[in-house]
């Protein structure tokens, strides 16, 4: 079984170092002349799947599907399946975090044997990094990945993430714990990544980190694609910029969406060349 870290590296090499977001916000649906219903959600996702089929990674924002209940989850299941059928890696942006049996259930849902299972999922470590163990174990057993929140772009996050813990920031502690988990898993590209926002007030030190780094917040949210190189001292090849609204606002036309994605992919292509 090929681990997620290697599959991600191969996908980036073939299709470029970019993660495109599917964020079906009600305002976007209305802007695309779609109803804010499960049917409108399905139409939105169908357009995105067609436009994004040639990109490396696509990240559906799970919260926008949850708001439509069972029908929304049905759309998400279909979207994940269609993207994976197109050889796109799917990163479910679910930000799950819990303990014990509940964390195990989330693990089965998102990176185990489940219709919702994606290639990777985002997770919150703020119940203690050890609480993620069931998720990390299930992901590893199925060749899937986990991206752990470390330093986010929202201003509220700094109060926790920049707080001192054992002489380092909490965000740095998370990075170091993820790094240790990757090293324990053996050689090769790490399958556990961290999330560091493009506009995070203070990026942790990533110079010794060997896993992938998801970098959301590029584009409309203020992150500049040309300024990502060297983030936290990470190797440029580790970075995976994530873009949603900057591209989605080009819709609803499939050619226009695809072209917007290609422009952003071109803007971050230098990350793969280093």
Curated annotation (Swiss-Prot):
GO molecular function: orotidine-5'-phosphate decarboxylase activity
Gene3D superfamilies named among the record's database cross-references: Aldolase class I
InterPro entries xrefs: Aldolase_TIM, OMPdecase_AS, OMPdecase_type-2, OMPdeCOase_dom, RibuloseP-bd_barrel
Enzyme class, broadest EC rank: lyase
GO annotation (BP), single: 'de novo' pyrimidine nucleobase biosynthetic process
Keyword flag Calcium: no
PROSITE patterns named in the record: OMPDECASE (PS00156)
Pathway: Pyrimidine metabolism; UMP biosynthesis via de novo pathway; UMP from orotate: step 2/2
Catalytic activity of the protein: orotidine 5'-phosphate + H(+) = UMP + CO2
Keyword annotations from UniProtKB, A to Z: Decarboxylase, Lyase, Pyrimidine biosynthesis
Record EC number: 4.1.1.23
Catalytic residues (positions): 95 (proton donor)
Pfam families: OMPdecase
Entry's family note: Belongs to the OMP decarboxylase family. Type 2 subfamily.
Leftover remarks: Was identified as a high-confidence drug target.
Protein name per UniProt: Orotidine 5'-phosphate decarboxylase
Gene name tied to this protein: pyrF
